[in-house]
Design a protein with these regions (language model features):
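Well-ordered secondary-structure scaffolds
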Residues: 1-266
C-alpha cells in the first residue's frame, strides 16, 4: 500500500511515521520553501537540506515521482517540493492524506485516491474526503470522523505547561526571517529569538525553543515563526509530539479501516 501525504510539517510527519512503521509506503509533498516550525521533527526539512532523520527514519528529497519510487525501494521516505501534488497521477496512491493544516481545503478531492483523509478543519467526510481526523487538543484529539467535519479553528494554540498563545512567536512585520537562537536553546522571557527586517521577535515566556523558522524564509506580519516549550525538556525537540502521534494514529485507523471496508472485511 502507498500513502501520499500533502504537507510534511511536524503533524504530517507524525502521521507518516506511524504509517511507515505499520508497513505502509509513504511519499510526502510540501512547499519548495517549507514553513514548518518544528523542523527537527518535520520531514519537510529534507527539501531544504537534501535529507533529514526523524526518530531513525531517513527522509530524502526526490525531484520527481520516478525518483520517489526508487527511494522507496531503497528504504528511504521521499519528500518532493510539489505543493500542487502533481506527482499524484504518476504515483497513483492507495491513500491520499491532506495534512497541510491550512484550516481549509486547498484542492483535495474525494476522488484523488481510493482513500482520501483530511486532517483538521476545512474538510467534510463524505464530500471532499472519506474521513477527517480531529486535530483540536482535548477529548477528541485524533478521533476519526467518517461523516461531518472536525471542530472549527479557534486560532488559540492548545495548552502546554499552562501556556497557550503565549508560547507561540509571531513575525513582527513582513519580510525575511533571520534566527538568532536555534532549536533546543534555553531562552528567557523578553529575549530576542530572531529578526525580520531589523525588527526583533521576542519571547513572551521562558523555556526551550522547540521550533523556529529556518533563516531566509519570507514571512508576513503575525505569521507563526517560533514555539517556546515551558516544560524545559530539550529532548522534546527531537521526538514526535503527543499531538502528532495522536493525529497520526487517527490517520492509520482511517486508512486501514477504509481499506478493510472496501474489501468487505468490515
Amino acid at each position: 500500500m502507498l500513502a501520499l501525504i500533502r504537507g510534511a510539517g511536524d503533524i504530517a510527519s507524525g502521521a507518516a511515521m506511524r504509517l511507515w512503521r505499520c508497513g505502509i509506503d509513504v511519499v510526502m509533498t510540501d512547499l519548495a520553501r517549507p514553513t514548518a516550525i518544528r523542523r527537527t521533527v518535520a520531514f519537510s526539512d529534507a527539501i531544504v537540506h537534501g535529507e533529514t532523520m526523524v526518530e531513525g527514519l531517513r527522509a530524502v528529497r526526490a525531484e520527481n515521482a520516478a525518483e520517489a519510487k526508487k527511494l522507496l525501494r531503497e528504504g528511504s521516505l521521499p519528500v518532493l517540493a510539489d505543493p500542487e501534488c502533481a506527482c499524484r497521477e504518476e504515483l497513483a496512491p492507495d491513500a491520499l492524506v491532506d495534512a497541510i493544516l491550512a484550516k481549509r481545503n486547498l484542492g483535495t478531492k474525494i476522488d484523488d485516491a481510493p482513500i482520501v483523509v483530511g486532517v483538521g478543519p476545512g474538510f467534510t467526510a463524505g464530500e471532499d474526503c472519506h474521513a477527517v481526523v480531529e486535530t483540536m487538543r482535548g477529548h477528541t484529539l485524533g478521533r476519526v470522523i467518517y461523516s461531518g467535519s472536525a471542530l472549527p479553528n479557534t486560532n488559540i494554540p492548545g495548552l502546554i505547561g499552562g501556556f497557550a498563545g503565549e508560547r507561540v512567536l509571531r513575525a513582527p512585520c513582513d519580510g525575511i526571517f533571520t534566527a538568532v537562537h536555534r532549536i533546543g536553546d534555553t531562552v528567557e522571557e523578553g529575549e530576542t529569538i530572531g529578526f525580520v527586517e531589523g525588527q526583533p521577535m521576542k519571547c513572551t515566556i521562558s523555556g526551550v525553543l522547540r521550533g523556529v523558522l529556518d533563516d531566509g524564509v519570507p514571512v508576513k506580519k503575525g505569521m507563526k515563526s517560533g514555539d517556546v516549550d515551558p516544560r524545559c525538556k530539550p529532548e522534546y525537540c527531537t521526538t514526535i509530539s503527543d499531538k502528532a502521534l495522536a493525529v497520526g494514529g487517527g490517520v492509520v485507523e482511517a486508512v486501514l479501516y477504509l481499506s478493510a471496508k472496501a474489501q468487505g472485511r468490515r
